[in-house]
Design a protein with these regions (language model features):
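Bacterial N-terminal signal peptides that target proteins for export
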Residues: 1-7
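C-terminal motif of bacterial Sec signal peptides marking the signal peptidase cleavage site
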Residues: 16-19
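Short, low-complexity, disordered segments immediately C-terminal to signal peptides
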Residues: 21-50
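Post-signal-peptide N-terminal segment of Sec-exported extracytoplasmic proteins
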Residues: 42-69, 90-91
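Active-site- and interface-proximal helix/loop "cap" or "latch" segments in soluble metabolic
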Residues: 67-121, 127-246, 253-261, 267-356
Length: 356
């Protein structure tokens, strides 16, 4: 009897141990996954720092808890936007039966990534975060008298992006949002990544903070939670201290569906130019763009558009890059080397900035 009891006891112990081992391995795998980090780079054009943030694992399961969304309105570039705002990550399911026609979808979707008309001045801060295996979140922040004047996000896709034509391309003004709008994935959310960018920017400026909880646009929140918000939080303490760089930008409406912005960044102590940016932006609707050949570039900019240079024949990006290089070398707002089509618009902004 004693021997029988020992054998039975050993058999039960083996069953218990065998039942425990898979759970232990799962827990170790979970701990290993949660300890992984993604690279984060930070700095202004004068200096670069490095930090790191944890990469949150995203799941897309039927039993994922649903977020309760609230309708929130905000204004940008003369348009009132209404988004389904949520806190936390959301995954927008699509069963291919949205019940929305392309015409109705085009009517309901609206985004505006171009800068607002006016002048912005203050201390300049910049940060970049690499997240989710190769995406890069970029943020510019301008602060004056302890008040946030500007928050501007962008995102660059990875080199191995599934759609080759968008690999390594920024999303805000390239036409990527148009690509999203034409994709069935947005049939239910009716928002693009640009909606999430501007929705966050509006909150941060209005509430004068970069950290803490923010709402995101339902259906486009993963980039915000994994990239944009970590990038903003990384600057939350830095913007409390004076920056070494000063930011000045002027944005004007040139008419006929075209606007432009000139940005000059200088070192405060020496007034040396560290960066010069110039871009021209097409209006948010084709109806506003008078030149029929340019209507296809609505909501894009000449500098960042994926297709503008090749299809228009105007090598705007190279011309501006050459101007930027010369301005930094000579430390002054130089004129374009040739009679570029955009020269007159650029010169008008230079005169107004230098006369201040």
């Amino acid at each position: 009897m004693k021997t029988k009891k020992i054998v039975v006891g050993l058999f039960c112990s083996m069953i218990i141990l065998m039942g425990c081992q898979p759970d232990q391995r799962t827990e170790k795998m979970k701990e290993s996954t949660e300890s992984e980090a993604v690279q984060v780079t930070s700095g202004t054009s004068a200096a670069t720092n490095a930090t790191s943030v944890k990469q949150e694992e995203q799941t897309n399961t039927n039993d994922q808890p649903k977020e309760s969304a609230a309708k929130v309105s905000y204004e940008r570039n003369g348009h009132t936007f209404e988004v389904d705002a949520v806190s936390g990550a959301t995954v927008e399911a699509n069963n291919g039966q949205s019940g929305i026609s392309p015409e109705e979808k085009a009517q309901k979707m609206y985004w505006s990534g171009r800068p607002e008309i006016g002048e912005v001045q203050g201390d300049y801060y910049h940060h970049e975060v690499v997240f989710d295996g190769g995406y890069t979140a970029l943020i510019d922040v301008v602060v004056k008298d302890q008040q946030i004047q500007l928050v501007e996000f962008d995102e660059r896709g990875p080199k191995n992006y599934y759609s080759e034509e968008w690999a390594g391309v920024t999303k805000r003004l390239s036409g990527y949002a148009n690509f999203q709008a034409n994709n069935a994935r947005t049939d239910q959310s009716l928002v693009t990544v640009v909606n999430t960018m501007t929705f966050l920017e509006n909150q941060m400026v209005a509430e004068n903070r970069l950290d803490g909880a923010f709402q995101t646009a339902k259906g486009q929140s993963n980039s915000a939670n994994n990239g944009y918000l970590p990038a903003a939080r990384a600057l939350a303490k830095e913007i409390k201290e004076p920056s070494k760089e000063h930011y000045t930008s002027l944005t004007e409406d040139f008419g006929e569906g075209l606007s432009g912005r000139l940005t000059v960044i200088t070192l405060k102590d020496s007034r040396k130019i560290t960066d010069l940016r110039y871009d021209e932006y097409f209006a948010d609707t084709e109806e506003e763009i008078k030149d029929a050949k340019l209507k296809a570039y609505s909501r894009q900019s000449k500098y960042f558009s994926k297709d503008y240079a090749q299809k228009s024949g105007e090598n705007f990006k190279k011309e501006v890059d050459d101007l930027r290089k010369k301005a930094i070398e000579e430390n002054k707002l130089v004129s374009p080397t040739n009679e570029e089509a955009w020269s007159e618009n650029y010169q008008s902004l230079v005169k107004k900035i230098t006369s201040q």
